[in-house]
């Protein structure tokens, strides 16, 4: 499972490979292809200065989540693919709002991106726990397409935790076990993959002494 996902990501490391893949499912002259291309370009530009803790360009994560949807989960809906490419833009990039996404793309994409995004911490007077509880409630009743994006996002985050601190790894593992796995089980999406990814991370904490 995880090895297949890693192979998919390795085989599509850049723009050329990504759009060769998109061209297999959507004509280059179609509105769907143009929509995905616009989302790709918008996201790449918005995140051009952002990097992950591992040092990797942040946009690689956004592209990887969309690849998991396309290649592993066989998503063929252009709105969902575009939303996957844009899924962190409301939460992480100043100046982007749900209304702006709707104007730039469409209301469905904007709604999907909103559903997978935490709201600004200022709304909760800096209380991260309350913000997380509110977000979990929102995602718990979200439409299936939003859940698919979020679970693919969470899976990719877990399989790339190697570049983060042990404290963050433990926090992400607990959160996934407590909240995301039950949602995955409810929708029957990526259950075994998340379990396998969590097992990998936890095994990495074990030091075998000879």
Language-model region placement:
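Active-site helical microenvironments for divalent-metal-assisted chemistry
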Residues: 1-210
């Amino acid at each position: 499972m995880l090895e297949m996902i890693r192979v998919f990501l390795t085989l599509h490391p850049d723009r050329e490979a990504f759009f060769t893949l998109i061209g297999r499912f959507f004509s280059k002259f179609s509105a769907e292809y143009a929509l995905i291309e616009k989302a790709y370009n918008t996201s790449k530009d918005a995140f051009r200065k952002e990097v992950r803790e591992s040092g990797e360009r942040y946009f690689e994560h956004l592209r990887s989540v969309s690849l998991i949807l396309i290649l592993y989960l066989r998503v063929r809906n252009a709105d969902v693919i575009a939303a996957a490419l844009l899924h962190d833009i409301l939460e992480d990039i100043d100046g982007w709002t749900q209304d702006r996404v709707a104007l730039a793309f469409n209301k469905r994409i904007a709604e999907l991106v909103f559903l997978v995004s935490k709201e600004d911490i200022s709304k909760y007077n800096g209380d991260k726990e309350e913000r997380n509880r509110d977000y979990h409630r929102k995602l718990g009743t979200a439409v299936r397409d939003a859940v698919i994006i979020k679970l693919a996002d969470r899976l990719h985050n877990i399989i790339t935790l190697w570049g983060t601190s042990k404290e963050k790894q433990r926090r992400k593992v607990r959160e996934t076990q407590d909240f995301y796995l039950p949602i995955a089980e409810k929708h029957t999406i990526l259950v075994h993959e998340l379990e396998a990814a969590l097992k990998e991370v936890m095994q990495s904490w074990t030091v075998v002494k000879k």
